[in-house]
Structures are given as C-alpha cells and as structure tokens.
C-alpha cells in the first residue's frame, strides 16, 4: 500500500510540473494573441473593445507589464478622450521608461494642444535639453517662448523700481480739492496691483522696502512707513527730489539744483556732487570734476580720489549688483569686483550698460550692441541699435527705432514694435510705451507660469 501511495505522489508531482511547464510555454503565446487582438481593435477604432481585450491580456500577464501593453493602454485612453488618464499614463511611462523619447514628445504636444502653459513651463526646458534633436519639442518650445498677452492699460508714465515693483502715474493729472489738477503716483507690484498709494506726486521706496520718501501736492517731502506714519521731515529745506534710502540710512537728494546726501532724519550733508546715485549694498557712486569714485557712507565727506571716467547706474538707481559694478577707466569699460577692487576680466569694452542682475550685460562695439557675461565672455555679437542688460532671462533690444524682447537664447520673443519699455518683471509682466506715448502691459506666458 505504501508503495502504491509513493507512486501516486510521484505521478502527481510529475503532473504538476508538467502543467506548470505547459502553462509557462503557452501563457506567452496566449498573452501575445490577446494583445494582438487588442491592438487590432484599437487600430480599427473600437476603443472600448480594445480596452476589454487589453484588460484580458493584462490579466494573463499578471502583475508584470511591458512597454507594448503600457503604450497601447496610453493610446486607448487618448482614443476614449480620457485626457486625464492619458496625461497620467504619459507621466508614468516617462518615469518607467526614461529612454523612450516618444512619451516626452506626446506629453509636450498634449500640453500645447490644451494650452496648458503651466504644464509646458514645467517640462519644456528639461525636455529640450534631454532631446535636443526632437523637432516637435523644439518647435513647441520656440512657439511657447513667443507667446504673450497684450493689455491696454494706457498709463501716462511708468518707472522701474525693481524686478517686483514699479512706480506709475496713471493719468496726466487728476482733479484734487477745488478741482485743482494734481499729479498722483502709486506703486504697483509685479502683477499690477497697487501696494502703496498716498495721493502724492512723487514716491521713493527705500532699499529694504520698509519706508518711503513722499512728496505731497504742495511739494513737501517727508519720510513715512508703509502705514503713512511719519518718520522724518525737515521744514528748513525745500527738496526738489529725493532718492532711495539705503539700508545704511543715507539717500541722494536735490536742493537748489545741487545733489547732496541726506540721512534718515533728512539732515543734509553739505558736500555737493556733480552727480551721484543712491546707496545699495552700502556702496554709491559720486562724481567730481568729471571723474567718479565708489564710496561708502562714511567716505562721502572725505573721499578725494576719483579713479573712474564713468560708473554705470542701473534702472533701480544703483551702481552695484551682487558686489559688482560697471566702471570705465582709460583702458575702457569693465566689471569691477568692489570688495577686491579688481576687474572681473582682462578684456575691455567700448561701453557697458549697468548690471540689472547677475545675468548678461549689454555692451557696445562700434554703433551696435550685444551681450556679454559678467566674466567678459561674449554671449551675443553686437547687432542691435541699442540694448539693455538681462533681467529674469530676458533683455530689451532696439531695431529700426523700436523696442522688442529677446530671451536667453537670443530668440526674438516679442518683435520690435514699441517706443520704449522697462525691464521684465519677475511675474513676466513688461510695461511698454505704445505709438501714442502711453504705457501698456505685455505678459510673457513662459515667465508668468515659471513657478
């Protein structure tokens, strides 16, 4: 009996192994046949039937998957117009099969067709770098770079304060008390919303953004905080203009047509300058007898050496950015490391614009302008009538008397068509002066959706 039982056990084991061997050899064929049927149904446009057959095929495959089945599932989602599932499947396949270029292209095309600018902004730069020869991705990238909105705001005047703040005069004048015409200016943030409006004819925001010199409708200047609480005034002096209060407590001021420095109590330093700028990072530029010097607040009274023929002042009213300044001596223009007192590079330029950021700066060669890195290397050959240094990856350039915008690849993203413009703000907003002389907005979609 024991022998019979042992023989039966052996037969059962052999049978089980035989069954497993049979299934292991027939399952791949069954799966391939089922997948082929699903593909045929998809190609014939029977997407629901294709989904049913694919599900059956996947059940034969078990927990494992293949690129072929995942790609078919992706395409069935698109055929069924299930765009959320289609997008998710593309993102998943990019993670699982990073070497398969087609999924990157399909995802970019999906975002482009749906005008999903945030989606494009989140992937295009990386995908162009990863697949530089993919024409579809490159074409969509270029088109997206040129995409912008135009808004007619019709402001009378706009001044650049920083990459997140502008000073605006909305109308030539407004009627005040007794219907007396008044000039009124206010500060707008990068998205165009008012952040400070004291009903004054002039505003000068401090370096740290916590206080403001304001000039009322009678021409009286005072220093106030953001809640309009009085910080300082000087009734003994009639200022014609006041600059930006530095974190060192010093600002440039004009009285009787002469430039001086004042402190946070609005007391005037007697020394007069041919020209000067506001303090930033503790440094300002002062001019005497046609020559310039870089000074700290404690050196304003004592400085006697003026080694530079020029010091470039940027649109914020400063001569220094991230410890660097653009200066000129007898050899030409160069970028100076202020802390070390040494040039950042050996070569010299005929002219350099001021640094607006740590990004490339505009240089002149002959009658044309191009762009150079802060280490002196040429980024773009001189080809424009005029140019401004880069901010936020974009720069204003002038051709045929009109201004447009180029990106970091020197691609003309906004064709020259405006009388003037300010630098590109953090939000992607740019203020441009139209043919009638008023200021409108354009919004660069790529920069707007960057974050």
Task: Place the predicted regions along the sequence by residue.
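Hydrophobic membrane-insertion alpha-helices, especially the h-region
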Residues: 5-20
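Residue-level detector of conserved, function-critical positions
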Residues: 22-451
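Residue-level detector of intrinsically disordered/flexible regions characterized by low predicted structural confidence
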Residues: 4-5, 261
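Positively charged n-region of N-terminal signal peptides that target proteins for export
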Residues: 1-4, 24
